[in-house]
Amino acid sequence: MTQSTAQILDGKATAAAIKAELTTRVSVLAAKGIVPGLGTILVGSDPGSTWYVGGKHKDCAEVGIQSIRRDLPEDISQEDLLEVVRELNDNPECTGYIVQLPLPKHIDQDVILEAMDPDKDADGLHPMNLGRLVANVNGEMKSPLPCTPKGCVELLRRHNIELKGKRVLVVGRGVTIGRPIGLLLTRKEVNATVILAHTGTVDLPAELKQADVVIAAAGVPHMIKAEDLKPGAVVLDVGVSRVDDGNGKAVVTGDVDPAAADVAAWLSPNPGGVGPMTRAMLLANVVESAERQAGIA
């Protein structure tokens, strides 16, 4: 068996370092009488969503952020849910919040998300904030950034991986990752050249062979094959799928073939790569919002 050549982009260790930095920043805010607060709106009792929300509040406790939970019944009306959104918009203790998705089918997700205060949008996916990202190519961003794209860029930066002038292939065009990450990567402070591939891309292997960096976010298990990668590429495995392990148990798997570790120079594990960074960036958005409100950001 040959030894893997890829170095690991360790999201767990990097996220832990970021949380330590955030703890210090929260202490500075506390000295001014300000305690950042993360709000969550959870509709129903889906086990996966409940687990995700619980993890976010556990992260809050680690860094000193106040938890504000709004756990609501599955059959809540859209108007009653909007009332909870308005309540968090007006709550001074809540500096940022999320609506856990997906929502039940009887609720219009777009209506709910657009009702959020953009300045309290901890996920960074409000249309206003995405629009600000489109419009601001070079200046300082003073609005929340999408957590997973921000986490990807930060993971690369903290491993001293240069992106300037590099050819970055993003696979997947979802609103959460694929579409906004191109906006971050093409800001002048990063200056990458971005190609966005998707299910309509005619020859994905040809694109992969030219890419210095691959960000796989399609949600298709092991679609990125080792033989298609450029030797020495940097590969971030962001996609999440659940597949049967052969024993009737669902296990989490990514978009990248494990054999990519024999070709890539750097590889993010999945799980344990971008996921912890996404959670850390959620906390960072909440703290940054509190800092802006305090006039120290």
Swiss-Prot record:
GO biological process: one example: methionine biosynthetic process
EC number: 1.5.1.5, 3.5.4.9
UniProt keyword annotation of Protein biosynthesis present: no
Pfam families, per database record: THF_DHG_CYH (PF00763), THF_DHG_CYH_C (PF02882)
Molecular function in Gene Ontology: methenyltetrahydrofolate cyclohydrolase activity; methylenetetrahydrofolate dehydrogenase (NADP+) activity
GO cellular component terms attached to this protein's record: cytosol
Gene3D superfamilies the record matches: Leucine Dehydrogenase, chain A, domain 1 (3.40.50.10860), NAD(P)-binding Rossmann-like Domain (3.40.50.720)
UniProt cross-references to CDD domains, sorted A to Z: NAD_bind_m-THF_DH_Cyclohyd (cd01080)
Residues that hold NADP(+) according to the record: G172, R173, G174, T199, V240
Keywords: Amino-acid biosynthesis, Histidine biosynthesis, Hydrolase, Methionine biosynthesis, Multifunctional enzyme, NADP, One-carbon metabolism, Oxidoreductase, Purine biosynthesis
Superkingdom: Bacteria
PANTHER family, sorted: C-1-TETRAHYDROFOLATE SYNTHASE, CYTOPLASMIC (PTHR48099:SF5), C-1-TETRAHYDROFOLATE SYNTHASE, CYTOPLASMIC-RELATED (PTHR48099)
Listed name of the protein: Bifunctional protein FolD 2
Organism: Paenarthrobacter aurescens (strain TC1)
Lineage, top ranks: Bacteria, Bacillati, Actinomycetota, Actinomycetes, Micrococcales
